[in-house]
């Protein structure tokens, strides 16, 4: 069974190229799908990462699924707030003969 967070790249506040390299590394290690996850302000970076991967690095990758949701998170002071999240699933065609 595959661990839950395997083949997942969490996007935060780093430069997009850092996440692009992480996604490309996952594909290079033999994964057929990679999920890019982000919340809040990092959503636009996640979208950029997916497009950079598809257009420049893994040209045969395609969007398998995109999910947008609202999550409730608890802040430092115990207050609950709602944050938008996105999960972008990129996939490559299965290797021939597999």
Task: Annotate each language-model stretch with its function.
Residues 63-98:
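C-terminal edge-of-domain segments
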Residues 11-15, 38-41, 45:
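Short amphipathic alpha-helical molecular recognition features
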Residues 29-35:
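Short, surface-exposed connector motifs at secondary-structure boundaries
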Residues 41-58:
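Conserved helicase motor "Helicase C" RecA-like lobe of SF1/SF2 P-loop NTPases
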Residues 29, 56-61:
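Arginine/glycine-rich "motif VI" loop of SF2 helicases in the C-terminal RecA-like domain
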Residues 10, 35-37, 87-89:
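Beta-strand cores of modular interaction/reader domains in eukaryotic scaffold and signaling proteins
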Residues 15-17, 42, 72, 94:
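Residues that cap or initiate secondary-structure elements
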Residues 1-27:
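Histone-fold modules and their flanking histone-like tails across chromatin and transcription assemblies
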């Amino acid at each position: 069974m595959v661990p839950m967070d395997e083949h997942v790249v969490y996007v935060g506040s780093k430069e997009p190229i850092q996440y692009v390299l992480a996604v490309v590394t996952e594909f290079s290690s033999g994964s057929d799908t990679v999920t890019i996850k982000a919340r809040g302000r990092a959503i636009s970076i996640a979208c950029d990462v997916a497009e950079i991967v598809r257009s420049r690095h893994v040209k045969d990758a395609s969007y398998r699924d995109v999910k947008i949701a609202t999550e409730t998170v608890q802040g430092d002071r115990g207050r609950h707030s709602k944050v938008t999240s996105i999960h972008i699933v990129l996939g490559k065609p299965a290797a021939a003969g597999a």
